[in-house]
UniProtKB/Swiss-Prot annotation:
<dbReference type="GO" id="GO:0006212">
    <property type="term" value="P:uracil catabolic process"/>
</dbReference>
<dbReference type="GO" id="GO:0019740">
    <property type="term" value="P:nitrogen utilization"/>
</dbReference>
<dbReference type="InterPro" id="IPR000868">
    <property type="entry name" value="Isochorismatase-like_dom"/>
</dbReference>
<comment type="similarity">
    <text>Belongs to the isochorismatase family. RutB subfamily.</text>
</comment>
<feature type="active site">
    <location>
        <position position="133"/>
    </location>
</feature>
<comment type="function">
    <text>Hydrolyzes ureidoacrylate to form aminoacrylate and carbamate. The carbamate hydrolyzes spontaneously, thereby releasing one of the nitrogen atoms of the pyrimidine ring as ammonia and one of its carbon atoms as CO2.</text>
</comment>
<dbReference type="GO" id="GO:0016811">
    <property type="term" value="F:hydrolase activity, acting on carbon-nitrogen (but not peptide) bonds, in linear amides"/>
</dbReference>
<dbReference type="InterPro" id="IPR036380">
    <property type="entry name" value="Isochorismatase-like_sf"/>
</dbReference>
<dbReference type="Pfam" id="PF00857">
    <property type="entry name" value="Isochorismatase"/>
</dbReference>
<feature type="active site" description="Proton acceptor">
    <location>
        <position position="24"/>
    </location>
</feature>
<dbReference type="InterPro" id="IPR019916">
    <property type="entry name" value="RutB"/>
</dbReference>
<feature type="active site" description="Nucleophile">
    <location>
        <position position="166"/>
    </location>
</feature>
<keyword id="KW-0378">Hydrolase</keyword>
<protein>
    <recommendedName>
        <fullName>Ureidoacrylate amidohydrolase RutB</fullName>
        <ecNumber>3.5.1.110</ecNumber>
    </recommendedName>
</protein>
<dbReference type="InterPro" id="IPR050272">
    <property type="entry name" value="Isochorismatase-like_hydrls"/>
</dbReference>
Amino acid sequence: MTTLTARPEAITFDPQQSALIVVDMQNAYATPGGYLDLAGFDVSTTRPVIANIQTAVTAARAAGMLIIWFQNGWDEQYVEAGGPGSPNFHKSNALKTMRNQPQLQGKLLAKGSWDYQLVDELVPQPGDIVLPKPRYSGFFNTPLDSILRSRGIRHLVFTGIATNVCVESTLRDGFFLEYFGVVLEDATHQAGPEFAQKAALFNIETFFGWVSDVETFCDALSPTSFARIA
């Protein structure tokens, strides 16, 4: 067991019965020329987030945590995105951007595309799990819940993009399913203005989970921390 300093209070968990969730670290969300950038969102400050996720993943893997990578997107025909009868059709900024810029049709968040791929710096390793997801929440229409329950995992540590959309949506759904969710704030990035990041973190630490940072997380997983707790 290890204790992680967090807001609003510390949380204790067993790393070997916990998972690090990396949400949508795709070119679409973190790279110039990707979907978010083309849709008018600022991705200029995502590089430190990528580096911090690398650090968190390395520490989590060494501590025996399961690493789960999400990729958001749909089939090449966008059947999985839903048609006009789906609210996703009307609210997805990727779909709206392609409708407004027909030359982008088939390029944004389509499985197999550069946009859909994880950024070059983040490479899943053997033993990691990579899951596609068709909506903001990683629990919707994916096997995430059954994967976690079959392994006795109840604690989830979140990183990725976007804090105020897919990260928060997945953590909230996990809360409703009795999972303990922690966000590493400097390993996440918002879609939109800075206040969106602050609002998402406020919601999480006040109502749905806990907030910490990468350095504190790595310190908690270090052998000396385990020795102190034991």
